[in-house]
Swiss-Prot record:
Quaternary structure and partners: Part of the 30S ribosomal subunit. Contacts protein S5. The interaction surface between S4 and S5 is involved in control of translational fidelity.
GO annotations of cellular component type: small ribosomal subunit
Role, per record: One of the primary rRNA binding proteins, it binds directly to 16S rRNA where it nucleates assembly of the body of the 30S subunit. With S5 and S12 plays an important role in translational accuracy.
GO molecular function ontology, one term from the record: rRNA binding
Keywords: Ribonucleoprotein, Ribosomal protein, RNA-binding, rRNA-binding
Protein name as it appears in the record: Small ribosomal subunit protein uS4
Family, as annotated: Belongs to the universal ribosomal protein uS4 family.
CDD domains: S4
Chain positions covered by the region annotation Disordered: 18-46
SUPFAM superfamilies the UniProt entry points to: Alpha-L RNA-binding motif
Signal peptide (UniProt feature, chain positions): none
Ranges for domain S4 RNA-binding: 94-156
GO biological process, one term: ribosomal small subunit biogenesis
Amino acid sequence: MTKRTSAKYKIDRRMGENIWGRPKSPVNRREYGPGQHGQRRKGKLSDFGIQLRAKQKLKGYYGDLTEKQFRRIYGEAERVKGDTGENLIGLLERRLDAVVYRAKFVPTVFAARQFVNHGHVLVNGKRVNIPSYRVKEGDVIEVREKSKQNVAVLEAVQLAERDVPDYIEVDHSKLTATFVRAPGLADVPYPVVMEPNLVVEFYAKN
């Protein structure tokens, strides 16, 4: 188990929100952050603090992306025509690990990253082991035949915690998914409020 995987609930506690909507999140039991000082009363956040929190929450949701990774994606969103915040969400949802998670092939986004890294996923019939690989409209993502009896996969397919969004068409009997289109913010089934507009404000000022 990687440090990032073992720390997934610390992200919830740091944000003070159950950002993946999981029943076992410690936030369901307590509302303070991690560490010995977590129970201290939090003061009112400044505009900077609110914007930073929005960025950290979005980074955390997609597997605790590094600042370098997230900043690179944001830079691409900024260069593409249209609303930068909406573009950012679309690019994040195009990540292969995000699609594997959305398709409910695995239970968590951290498991999705590991699953892709270990070569369990095919894109258009070819093995792809890069979690950040950008999926295109019409791409078919599937679990390799040898990996279809993976316990994590079997458990995830049975989960009722997450609905598959309509921008991905999934056949769980075959463990295949087709990426239909890049979504906007309103299309993505986040369990908590995500505010990419605040991320745009953060980078505009910093």
